[in-house]
Each structure stands twice: as C-alpha cells, then as structure tokens.
Curated annotation (Swiss-Prot):
GO cellular component terms, A-Z: cytosol
Phosphoprotein found in the keyword field: no
Gene source species: Shewanella denitrificans (strain OS217 / ATCC BAA-1090 / DSM 15013)
GO molecular function terms noted in the UniProt entry: protein-lysine N-methyltransferase activity
Keyword annotations of the record: Cytoplasm, Methyltransferase, S-adenosyl-L-methionine, Transferase
Example GO biological process: methylation
Name assigned to this protein: Ribosomal protein L11 methyltransferase
The gene coding this protein: prmA
Sections of the chain in a coiled coil: none
InterPro entries: Ribosomal_L11_MeTrfase_PrmA, Ribosomal_PrmA_MeTrfase, SAM-dependent_MTases_sf
Length: 293
C-alpha cells in the first residue's frame, strides 16, 4: 500500500517531542534525519544523539488526512504557525529487495572480496568473505573498515596470530583468517557483536580458528603477532597501554576509527610503544600502522 510522508524541520531540543505528537496522531513510524549533513562522532555509551538541525519524518497510511495534524502542530510553541514542513506521497515498494539491491561485492586490495550472501561471487578463486549487513558495525562500506581490510590484504598473515580489538561484525577477524592467519581472537564490549561475529564465522567456515570474548572474559596474557583495532580515537588513546601489551615485539599494529585531524596526535602517543608509519587516509578518516618496539 502507498503511504503519506510528513517531513518537519526542527532542532534536537524538540525532535523527540514532535515525534511523540505525530505518533499520537496516528503515524506508523517516526525517523530522524540530519538537516544539514552534520557528522556526529563518538557519542557516549548508550546515547542516541540528534543533530542540531533535525528533520522529523513521519509515515502515515495513504488515506490519512494530515490537515488536522498540521493544524495541531502549528499551535505548538515548538513550531509555530507556518512551520517548515513537506507532505508527499510515497510509492509502495519491496523495501527489503531495494535494501538488498544496494549491497554489492566489494574488492579490497588485490586479493580480498566482501560479498553479500545473496550475490554471486564475482571471483571464486579470490579470497572471499561472505557477510551480510546486520546488527553489528562492519560490512566494508565504511572508510575505516575499508582501510583496515586493505591493510590486512597487504600483509603475509601465514601462520600469524591476530587480535581484532573491537571486532563488531567480525569482518576483520574473518578476513584475517581467510588471508592465512593461523588463529584470530576477537574482543568486543557488546555481546551482540560477539554473537554476530560467531554467526559470520560459521557462515565462512572459520569458527574453529576464531575465539571471541567480552573484555572481562579474555585470557590473561593474550598476545599476538598482529593487532587491528577499528574503534574510535577516544578509546584508542585510553586503551593504548593495554593494546600495546597485546602485540609481540616486532608485531604489527593497525588503528582506525579516527578522523584525519586526530591521526597525528594519536600517532605521537602510540610512538611510545611502536615505530609508527605515516597515516593513510580515506575520505575524512584515517588509519595508523606501526611496528612494536
């Protein structure tokens, strides 16, 4: 069935309250969009931040008369008369199919491909990781994930032990195993990430080589030849001593999840333990690599 969509321009202070009013008026869904392409980085744990300029998007059944809803909102001091809004008809679609059609196999480096399960593998003889978008972060489409995948592809991981620190979907851990690593340990603070990583490992038939832990459960003295951490600049700095002690002397490190302007300072901080390389950049993001001293 078709739908009617009401879009309202507001700010982060009023967005939730406006959404509540729209739900009371019969909206079947409420979503929030960025009104001015403003990025939000490193929200607090458990926080769902909104942009200062927020668009509240409400979806109604096609037969809904929105005039009373618009009139009600116009009386609110949050919006006022003649508040900016837009009403449009939304055609009915197979939204699941449209979502699936937006994901394609992607190549990283020279050997590695990430392929959704519903797509034909373009190069069966390549190193292929089968991964579908899901709850946990990491499908290869984000620049930080891409930077880490390209780095892993550039390494000879034969018989190496690897730690994926902040494993998310398990994409980096599974890629490392497919690229020849002997064993990979994934650590994440989110139990959903652990579950997602396990499911993806089973799908790629590498579950026997992948050990997954919440931080409080990881083995004492855990150490590896290669460590990759695609998290955020704040945790990367806070956890630097812990990360450093998990890399053997002469071992390799990759850090991502940080903005270009954060790279230089973080590289200087990690130089206490690592011989750091020049940063690599993709879009607004960066990756740091180094060798353990």
């Amino acid at each position: 069935m078709p739908w009617i969509q009401l879009r309202i321009n507001t700010n982060s202070d009023h967005a939730d309250a406006i959404g509540d009013i729209l739900m009371e008026q019969g909206a079947v869904s409420i979503t929030y969009e960025d009104g001015k392409d403003t990025p939000i980085f490193e929200p607090k744990l458990g926080e769902t931040p909104l942009w200062q300029d927020t668009v509240v998007v409400a979806l109604f059944d096609a037969g809904t008369d929105l005039a009373p809803t618009v009139a009600l909102l116009a009386t609110s001091p949050m919006l006022g008369e003649n508040f900016p809004h837009k009403i449009e008809q939304i055609e009915d679609k197979d939204w699941v199919r449209e979502w699936m059609d937006s994901f394609h196999p992607i190549q990283f480096g020279t050997r590695l491909w990430i392929c959704p399960s519903w797509r034909e593998i373009p190069h069966p003889d390549a190193v292929n990781v089968i991964l579908d978008p899901g709850l946990a972060f990491g499908t290869g489409t984000h620049p930080t994930t891409a930077l880490c995948l390209e780095w892993l592809d550039s390494l000879d991981l034969s018989d190496e032990e690897v730690i994926d620190f902040g494993c998310g979907s398990g994409i980096l851990a599974i890629a490392a195993l497919k690229l020849g690593a002997k064993k990979v340990t994934g650590v994440d603070i989110d139990y959903q990430a652990i579950d997602a990583s396990q499911a993806n490992a089973v799908r790629n038939n590498v579950q026997d080589q992948l050990a997954l832990y919440l931080p409080e459960d990881q083995p004492e003295g855990l150490i590896a030849d290669v460590l990759v951490a695609n998290i955020l600049a704040g945790p990367l700095r806070e956890l630097a001593p812990l990360i450093a002690e998990k890399v053997r002397q002469g071992g390799k490190l990759a850090l991502s999840g940080l903005l270009q302007e954060q790279a230089e300072e973080l590289a200087e901080f990690y130089s206490q333990w690592f011989q750091m390389d020049p940063p690599a950049y993709k879009d607004d993001w960066s990756r740091l690599t180094g060798i353990r001293k």
